[in-house]
């Protein structure tokens, strides 16, 4: 993505026999700054993925104890492992979407057909959606922490991050 933009700007300047203009350099600098914010966001989520998933699951099961009770949809270790795996997969694809700035990878490779799969397996979509919302809350809190990240306004990327979680929750509800 970034190298394509750099290559295009250089090719345009070269075709005109000119140096890169201040406007072109400023635009490329903004692109790099945006890329750094995306990298910081993904690094933060990736570094905390296990706790994001585990804490979201713990909170979900505290609110909906019937899920883990005998006969519940997450009762038995095998079902619990599958639940945690699915939450982790959704989180992973959210990071891919944030990194690329494009929800299509989330839609195409993760969410497409997920609701139907859960319906066929008897998994309550509303519970999955609530688990996704809990992951969203945790991820947004982690990304919003200003310590040790690139300085600048991150409100747009935080909003974008939230929108990917909202899309995932809506897809399974």
Curated annotation (Swiss-Prot):
Function text: Light-harvesting photosynthetic bile pigment-protein from the phycobiliprotein complex (phycobilisome, PBS). Phycocyanin is the major phycobiliprotein in the PBS rod.
Any matching Pfam family: Phycobilisome
Binding residues for (2R,3E)-phycocyanobilin 1: 83
Gene expressing this chain: cpcB2
Keyword Transport: yes
Family annotation (InterPro entries): Globin-like_sf, Phycobilisome_asu/bsu, Phycobilisome_asu/bsu_sf, Phycocyanin_b
PTM remark: Contains two covalently linked bilin chromophores.
Record-level GO cellular component terms: phycobilisome; plasma membrane-derived thylakoid membrane
Quaternary structure (record): Heterodimer of an alpha and a beta subunit, which further assembles into trimers and the trimers into hexamers.
Annotated keywords: Antenna complex, Bile pigment, Chromophore, Electron transport, Membrane, Methylation, Photosynthesis, Phycobilisome, Thylakoid, Transport
Official protein name in the record: C-phycocyanin-2 beta subunit
Principal subcellular localization: membrane
Record's bilayer topology term: Peripheral membrane protein
Annotated residues for binding of (2R,3E)-phycocyanobilin 2: 154
Residues with N4-methylasparagine modification: 73
Family listed: Belongs to the phycobiliprotein family.
Presence of keyword Electron transport: yes
NCBIfam families membership: phycocy_beta
